[in-house]
């Protein structure tokens, strides 16, 4: 689910005219942080643009549907 979420973020950023190098912050919600943090973080580390790590917060939360394991809120800017 993390990869699908990041793919969606890439698509939405492109539609807005920006990309992941312009992400300022990300809030990550995990259904079970103890179980899923390491796997999510490995996918995140492979995805994030080198030299452009945004501020990031990761919390455990009850998500909107039982089968959802990860949700992300992204704040990005448009390039000049």
Protein language model features and the residues they cover:
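Short, polar/acidic, helix-capping and beta-turn segments at strand->helix junctions
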Residues: 1-80
